[in-house]
Design a protein with these regions (language model features):
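Glycine-rich phosphate-binding "P-loop"
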Residues: 52-63, 85, 168-180
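Alpha-helical scaffolding within the catalytic cores
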Residues: 67-71, 93-98, 118-121, 186-189, ...
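Histidine-centered divalent metal-coordination motifs
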Residues: 6-12, 167, 205
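Mid-to-C-terminal alpha-helical segments outside catalytic/metal-binding sites
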Residues: 1-5, 13-73, 77, 82, ...
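Conserved, mostly hydrophobic/aromatic
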Residues: 6, 75, 126, 134, ...
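Active-site neighborhood of phospho(di)ester-bond hydrolases with catalytic His/Asp-centered motifs
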Residues: 2-5, 85-86, 110-111, 135, ...
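Active-site gating/metal-coordination segments in enzymes
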Residues: 81-82, 86-172
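Catalytic pocket-lining loop regions of alpha/beta-barrel enzymes
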Residues: 133, 143-249
Length: 290
């Protein structure tokens, strides 16, 4: 069974409205990046200013594809049986995702919480109703990784021993230089990871432009898992070497990326090793979904 560990549904951020009529993801810069296997011959590390602006624009266009009908269509085309879908409160809520997944067994909803009155009760109810994990996104939520809220949130969530998928990597989302990209710096996540050793933390995108930071954290903490979206084959192979075959998993971050490309890299990383292939493309995330 192939499971995409990282996908999203309707997330109306910065005025972007999901449009079922928008069905293609061939935007020049992002499409080129996918075709090249997420290798970038033009620059190393973070993109320069003009490229950042183009990436932000293309991200908004791709986000507008993010409805359930399109996700299922991309899953069918890519040979994906199930997808973990991740809300980002306050833009999309646990309730939005529970409703979207209610009659679609191929979608596995996570919960999300935001520092607003009543979040504790909402989180408890979301888990009771079927959410299988928690999504944290410091950049888009505009909450610093060191903020007391995340520690209170994990204190509440940790006894369930469910996975927490946290965005990792400094990145401008949809608006260039809005001042919050630094919240994705993985070095700022260590206190949270260390404080809750019983919680499986999945680093979404494995650090984006800074995978070495994700690898260092995974090397130091056994409760850190690595998700492969936007990472080239070389980095995925290194992740398997550093973290081991049980702590790396395929994810695409759909609709920001066509799942075919990240899945192709995961399959190449497995080579002819059938057990590794199954672990990367389903077993590892399935083992965390209690």
């Amino acid at each position: 069974m192939v499971i995409d560990a990282h996908a999203h549904l309707e997330t109306p951020i910065h005025g972007v409205t999901p449009d079922p009529g928008r069905r293609r993801s061939t935007h020049l810069l992002m499409w080129s990046y996918e075709i090249l296997g997420f290798r970038n011959p033009l620059w190393k590390g973070e993109p320069p200013g003009p490229a950042r602006a183009l990436i932000a624009m293309e991200n908004r266009l791709r986000l507008s594809m993010g409805c359930k009908e399109n996700l299922l269509r991309y899953m069918d085309r890519s040979g994906i049986e199930k997808s973990v879908v991740l809300p980002i409160a306050p833009f999309s809520t646990s309730w939005d995702y529970l409703e979207a997944c209610a009659e679609e067994p191929r979608l596995i909803p996570f919960a999300s919480a935001f520092p607003a009155p009543g979040w504790e009760k909402d989180l408890e109810e979301a888990v009771k109703r079927g959410c299988r994990g928690l999504k944290i996104h410091p950049i888009l939520q505009r909450v610093a990784p060191e903020d007391r809220f995340y520690f209170d949130l994990l204190e509440e969530f940790a006894p369930r021993r469910m996975p927490v998928l946290i965005h990792s990597g400094e990145f401008d989302y949809y608006v260039v230089r809005d001042g919050f990209a630094a919240y994705g710096d993985i070095s700022r996540y260590e206190k949270l990871v260390r404080a809750f050793p019983e919680v499986p933390f999945i680093l979404g995108h494995m650090g984006l432009y800074f995978p070495e930071k994700a690898l260092r954290l995974a090397e130091r903490y056994e409760n850190v898992y690595l998700e492969t979206s936007f990472q080239p084959l070389k980095v995925v192979r290194e992740a398997i070497r550093v973290a081991g075959v049980e702590r790396v998993m395929f994810g695409s971050d759909w609709p920001e990326s066509d799942p075919r490309y990240a899945l192709r890299i995961a399959l190449k990383a497995a080579g002819g090793d059938e057990e590794l292939r199954r672990r990367l493309t389903g077993w590892n995330i399935l083992a965390l979904l209690r």
